Amino acid sequence: MTIRHQGQQYRPRMAFLQKIEALVKDMQNPDTGVKTQSQRVLVTSVPHAMTGGDVLQWIIQRLWISSLEAQNLGNFIVKYGYIYPLQDPKNLILKPDSSLYRFQTPYFWPTQQWPAEDTDYAIYLAKRNIKKKGILEEYEKENYNFLNKKINYKWDFVIMQAKEQYRAGKERNKADRYALDCQEKAYWLVHRCPPGMNDVLDYGLDRVTNPNEVKKQTITAVKKEIMYYQQALMRSTVKSSVSLGGIVKYSEQFSSNDAIMSGCLPSNPWITDDTQFWDLNAKLVEIPTKMRVERWAFNFSELIRDPKGRQSFQYFLRKEFSGENLGFWEACEDLKYGDQSKVKEKAEEIYKLFLAPGARRWINIDGKTMDITVKGLKHPHRYVLDAAQTHIYMLMKKDSYARYLKSPIYKEMLAKAIEPQETTKKSSTLPFIRRHLRSSPSPVILRQLEEEAKAREAANTVDITQVMSKLDRRSLLKKELPPK
């Protein structure tokens, strides 16, 4: 049997169908496969039929799996249309009894190139309409009317094809005609499933490109591949022990700055009511904490990422008459992550301020980088200054950063840095125990308490004698008053 391997290159999630097809081919082996024979269905003898129990037993013996796994796999095969039931076509499960099944012809397998188009489905429905004399199921009637409106321009062709196929089918013998009808019905139950059934072939939109297609390599592509492998050979390999040592060193270096592992100083504001931690670690606080200043010495990225560290580094660069380097880097960051509707204006402004001949804050970059940058500014975009920005970044990292750490500015900042002490709590002797926040009472509960208090006041018993005595006193006072 020759099976075309088509239709899967655009459907990466359907690649497992190849394994199912290989298993179905083994099932159809005349020597080691599932035993088939002619079976009588209604008044017709159908050739090459088999029972669900035989299929289940063959799967168990062939794959050495449990009966439950074999049942699930059998249901899987039936749902994808490789085996179809003869007696209950809509029930796409493998019954482990004497229910009759039949192998689907490879022409109707899901991996074939031809798709289930509307025209083919319309011809099938028109043929069933002729055969059943207009008695179709409800969902088939709806699809028939919908397709009649959708492809009305070629409906005459659909009816003509349906009549020709119906006429050709009547010329076949009864068994072949019944088998072909079952095959078509099983195919369309999978590809145009009725309402309420699971569409197992729903894989989404087709891909525009074929990821498995073998493309013809050009000379340029081969040269790039050779260059890549040459660079890979020249690249120095690192032992796993060295890599793991680097990870351990990094973890030890940053462990003191991990708020979860080492805690927060003076206290965690999310657990306590103290907001001093936020005040001490504000972006541009006047005097930062010692831990924050020490972190600037870890690497250059930690320094330039911190707004306070960047401010201190800018002050140092101005003293060295190279403050334009950090200014250019910040302008490039604003170009990349700022308002993109003003990219062109920002790029022109950066060029005039930092790159143009005789610019007020001219930066020193090599000629090759300058040529790439100027050429890219003809069509500006957010990454047009990446080459120049990388050059300046590496210049500051390798030259200015080391001098900054040795400068009096950094040493003075480190000496003045605050080292907050942990807030002690009398209620707890263990450092990891934290006082939980007390939530304020819910407004709903407060309203309920007020209503209950009013109800209690209204329910208090009233002394009638006291009320009557008060009314009598008021009436006597009115009588004793002299007339005006």
UniProtKB/Swiss-Prot annotation:
It is found in: Membrane. Keywords: Membrane, Sensory transduction, Signal transduction inhibitor, Vision. It is a peripheral membrane protein. Residues 219-280 form the G protein gamma domain. Phosphorylation is decreased by light exposition. Gene3D superfamilies: 1.10.1240.60, Regulator of G-protein Signalling 4, domain 2, Transducin (heterotrimeric G protein), gamma chain, Winged helix-like DNA-binding domain superfamily/Winged helix DNA-binding domain. Residues 30-105 form the DEP domain. Residues 299-414 form the RGS domain. CDD domains: DEP_RGS7-like (cd04450), GGL (cd00068), RGS_RGS9 (cd08739). It holds the Pfam family RGS_DHEX. The keyword Cell membrane does not apply. The keyword Iron does not apply. One of its GO terms (molecular function) is GTPase activator activity. PROSITE patterns: DEP, RGS. GO terms for cellular component: cytoplasm; neuron projection; plasma membrane. One of its GO terms (biological process) is regulation of G protein-coupled receptor signaling pathway. Heterodimer with Gbeta5. Interacts with RGS7BP, leading to regulate the subcellular location of the heterodimer formed with Gbeta5. Component of the RGS9-1-Gbeta5 complex composed of RGS9 (RGS9-1), Gbeta5 (GNB5) and RGS9BP. Inhibits signal transduction by increasing the GTPase activity of G protein alpha subunits thereby driving them into their inactive GDP-bound form. Binds to G(t)-alpha. Involved in phototransduction; key element in the recovery phase of visual transduction. This is Regulator of G-protein signaling 9. It comes from Tamias striatus (Eastern chipmunk).
